[in-house]
A protein has these predicted regions:
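Low-complexity, flexible helical/coil segments
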Residues: 71-74, 113-118, 126-130, 210-214, ...
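Acyl-donor binding region in acyl/amide transferases
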Residues: 74-77, 82-83, 94-200, 314-377
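A conserved beta-strand-loop-helix scaffold within acyl/acetyltransferase catalytic domains
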Residues: 25-111, 163, 173-329, 413-418
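Active-site/acyl-donor-binding loops of N-acyltransferases
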Residues: 2-7, 13-32, 95-96, 179-180, ...
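Polar/charged alpha-helical tracts
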Residues: 47, 84, 148-160, 164, ...
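Compositionally biased, intrinsically disordered/low-complexity regions enriched for serine, proline
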Residues: 6-7, 15, 36, 51, ...
Length: 420
């Protein structure tokens, strides 16, 4: 570890088909590949799973916590490629009924909404997706030191296995959720050859912090914003802050604040921005100190929390909850932001990743954006051709009001910097 469903039984993981798909290849040190659908990431040891991925806090422990408390309607599992009995590739999976209307912007959004009302089964298919509803970066695990040819071969085998598994569990659409620009550089061609299309997902905001202290960071902001932040911090002077590794005894309050904050969001992404019951306690317990929570109290009462994951060179801000209208009266969002910036600088952590919402504020505060993609394909060839034709009109970023307003002012990181 790195620290610094309707129509189908909900417990899909216990009903995974036991098939194994074998793939023999040439010109590679890998002798023979078999791809197996597994009911959980725990079917592979923690060390064997983590060895396939770059060091990250969103590792086996994180995925296990997500499996134990999924959002409503989600079921989690995994797919692993083996060379003999040695795992050489792996992806986490989830299955969910997904509203296709969510991904279409003008001019198809009106038609999609109409079809959703008239043909709900057509517009709400059962999707089998690579990734996690709790992660903003799609984990594609390939064995360390794999050559380019081996990496392509392992991914192609995983894709073939996914097609078989999707058919076995009744999913008509396959998807890769939030593939980073960095992974798209090597995986795109293989995915396209396998019949996948893609459209933009929501980008991820990243703040680079190569500063010696908070004053240096503030000096990079516009003078008017600096004055505004100083005023907001003075208004929040009564707020008491604690950084903890446990929410024992307060998890009900944390869940309540999270639900309250969801009701104030400008865009609703359904269960994709929700968590399951007891998720926060599971996360804090499973991540052994990599998960921290900033607790803000006013007069002894919890008014805000911010769950974040600590890596060697990056902090991932994952979940925030605030009490309203206190949040606005005391500028708790900005207070949380500056306290997290202070934490990163104090710990010499150079990057603060803040997720897929509230882009306008994050850009003003110095963030840049990492592009990400959703790759998808239908199992039926004709339906897949129709989805391919609709792909240019699909884009989650077009549904976000902040991104529409930012337009060309949004600054994106180049693809080769999208991977930490």
């Amino acid at each position: 570890m790195v620290c610094g469903i309707r129509g189908r039984p909900p417990n899909l993981a216990s009903r995974i088909s036991p098939w194994a798909h074998s793939c023999n290849g040439r010109g590679s040190a890998i002798s023979s590949l078999s791809v197996r659908a597994l009911p959980s990431v725990t079917a592979v040891s923690r060390d064997a799973w983590n060895a396939l991925f770059p060091p990250t806090a969103e590792d086996w422990n994180f995925l296990r916590a997500s499996e134990m408390a999924p959002p409503a309607g989600f079921s989690a599992s995994a797919l692993v490629a083996f060379d003999g009995d040695q795992p050489v590739g792996a992806v986490p999976l989830f299955q969910v009924k997904f509203s296709l209307a969510m991904v279409f912007g003008p001019p198809l959004n009106t038609i999609a909404d109409w079809l959703s009302r008239g043909r709900p089964a057509l517009m709400n298919p059962l999707v089998l997706a690579v990734g996690s509803p709790q992660s903003e970066e799609c984990p594609i695990g390939i064995r360390r030191f794999a050559t380019a040819a081996e990496r392509t071969r392992i991914l192609a085998s995983i894709l073939q296995g996914l097609l078989h598994h999707a058919d076995a569990v009744g999913s008509s659409i396959l998807a890769f959720k939030d593939v980073t620009d960095g992974d798209a550089l090597w995986a795109h061609e293989t995915l396209i050859q396998a019949g996948f299309s893609r459209f933009p997902s929501l980008p991820v905001a990243v703040l680079e912090l190569p500063f010696r202290d908070e004053a240096e960071y503030l000096a990079t902001l516009k003078p008017r914003l600096r004055s505004e932040l100083r005023r907001k911090m003075k208004q929040a002077a009564e707020v008491e802050t604690e950084i903890a590794t446990s929410i024992d005894g307060i998890h009900d309050q944390v869940a309540e604040l999270f639900r309250e904050t969801r009701t104030h969001r400008r865009v609703d992404y359904g269960s994709f921005d929700d968590v399951g019951p007891n998720f926060f306690p599971e996360l804090m317990r499973n991540l052994n100190g990599c998960a921290r929570v900033m607790l803000c109290r006013l007069g002894g009462k919890l008014v805000s929390f911010n769950v974040f994951l600590v890596e060697r060179n990056r902090v991932l801000a994952k979940y925030i909850g605030m009490r309203y209208p206190i949040a606005r009266q005391y500028n708790l969002y900005y207070y949380n932001w500056l306290m997290m910036v202070r934490f990163c600088i104090d710990q010499a952590i150079p990057q603060f990743q803040t997720g897929q919402t509230t882009y306008e504020i994050k850009m003003r505060l110095g963030s840049k954006l990492k592009r990400s993609w959703i790759y998808f394909r239908h199992l039926q060839p004709l339906a897949n051709r129709l989805l391919h034709a609709a792909a240019p009109f699909a884009a989650l970023d077009r549904r976000d009001a902040d991104l529409r307003e930012l337009g060309s002012k949004a600054v994106y990181l180049p693809a080769n910097r999208s991977q930490t």
